[in-house]
């Protein structure tokens, strides 16, 4: 089968393209914005990419068009598909019908930590010899690819609550039918499609409704919103993490060396295993608890899973070191929600000690562009010594609010820019040896990471 994917460079659709290719299909695709690591991954798979959504792409005559949720009515190619009554489906529906239907699906849902937790879970199963298939919204460094199809009975998937397509407004995860589902956390996000937290809770309850009675829900026991979801109705076994009577970290963290930590995991009163790894922060320990509990559901002993986490390498764009120049380290992170920004900076502060942190932020997610959470930005940036914000001056990524005003509570610590080159000059001029620069965006950010490294190197 030849499938042509509209919106192929999104993290989900790009992974789906890889799965389709590995299943033996001919895959082509198009998108408006192409940037690493997804573009690199697709090209390595031999998938042809086409820039833009020109209507003449129907001349490729694929057997099926697979539509990403970035596509809306008015898109030239989509309009041509509709006018000609050509066959099309959504990405999640195609995945559910062609890949997941005969698998034991382990799904990871939640506002934050989905990508990291999915990667942890896939790695635990891999290290245990389960050879799982997976689809992750990033590139796990243990695998070097965001998606893989195997002949294993098990498939691990990052389960996103964003809507499926313009013609199917249900959350993507209702198509996955997991037997094991992690509900990692839940707070308001995606303000472009959800009016409030209650609307998101409804979608999460739809997910709960799809888990079979013999399945299991792994739930963050600290989250009131998730408890509200369960009170609407639950027909599956529930295990909680982050609370004393469930999976929890029972002993204080032990600092082994710079950038490393160890902690004991308990399941209720019983010690379940010790994790020694290079990750930092309470959020990653919570992610680990969820992954260990889910892996236990398919038969991996917790002590074995804990040992596997000692070999876990985090996902690209999750505090990924992009380079060092002039004594300054530059990190790349996907954080774009105030909670994620705060968590990222808190983790870096713990690692960096008294070293200066320079936060470089592009608030370009749909929620951030609407300004719904702009008032939370200053507090989320509290651990940064200097803040450099960027707002595109025009186009689809431009902000509907004033970034300078939003950052004003930070005083002289914060500056806002509308051009990337000016931003690079300012950051480079401010940086000192020993500083830690963390770039936070859910997009390519104009290749700013390499521009910063080049500017710092030229200054040295």
Tell where the protein language model's regions lie, with residue ranges.
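Beta-strand->loop->alpha-helix junctions that form or flank phosphate-binding loops
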Residues: 50-53, 91-96, 134-138, 233-257, ...
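Acidic-glycine-rich active-site phosphate/pyrophosphate-binding loop
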Residues: 253-273
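Glycine/charged-rich beta-loop-alpha catalytic/anionic-binding loops adjacent to active sites
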Residues: 101-104, 243, 267-277, 323-328
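Short acidic loop-to-helix transition motifs that present clustered carboxylates
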Residues: 34-35, 55-57, 93-96, 139-143, ...
